[in-house]
């Protein structure tokens, strides 16, 4: 009786521990697709077209601008800041985008892991301490500028992913 159970378990042993790794190309493809989806969601919000991502708006300097070269760590840091900003906006338009940013950060962590990189916990979020004051003064402007700059940053990230960014 015990032998049959043991034999059955030993027969299944290789299948129980067989884990097929997800090809890194699939993760990179999913990352690019999610970036394109987020950009499309931003485009669907009509009022984001009114501000250039390069335009400077007084009081909103804490919102990241465009970067010429981004590493995976810098991408994660930038997305963490945008996610923190979007979470604090009361608009319903940004809830799904904020959730998508969380998923995008998870995919970036997988890409980093595949390159044996360790992404540190996102820091610099302490610069957002004054976010509440800014939101009270200019809620609409903050949303428009944040989404516009996020869109530009995502397009930069899409381009950088084709170049296989470093850690």
Curated annotation (Swiss-Prot):
Domain of life: Eukaryota
Residues of the signal peptide: 1-21
GO cellular component, one term: extracellular space
Major place of residence: secreted
GO molecular function terms listed in the Swiss-Prot or TrEMBL record: DNA binding; hormone activity; leptin receptor binding; peptide hormone receptor binding
Gene3D superfamilies, A to Z: 1.20.1250.10
Compartments (UniProt record): Secreted
Cystine pairs: 117-167
Keyword annotations of the record: Disulfide bond, Obesity, Secreted, Signal
Pfam family, one: Leptin
GO biological process: activation of protein kinase C activity; adipose tissue development; adult feeding behavior; angiogenesis; aorta development; bile acid metabolic process; bone growth; cell surface receptor signaling pathway via JAK-STAT
Sequence similarity: Belongs to the leptin family.
Job description of the protein: Key player in the regulation of energy balance and body weight control. Once released into the circulation, has central and peripheral effects by binding LEPR, found in many tissues, which results in the activation of several major signaling pathways. In the hypothalamus, acts as an appetite-regulating factor that induces a decrease in food intake and an increase in energy consumption by inducing anorexinogenic factors and suppressing orexigenic neuropeptides, also regulates bone mass and secretion of hypothalamo-pituitary-adrenal hormones.
PANTHER family, A to Z: LEPTIN (PTHR11724:SF1)
Protein's name according to its UniProt entry: Leptin
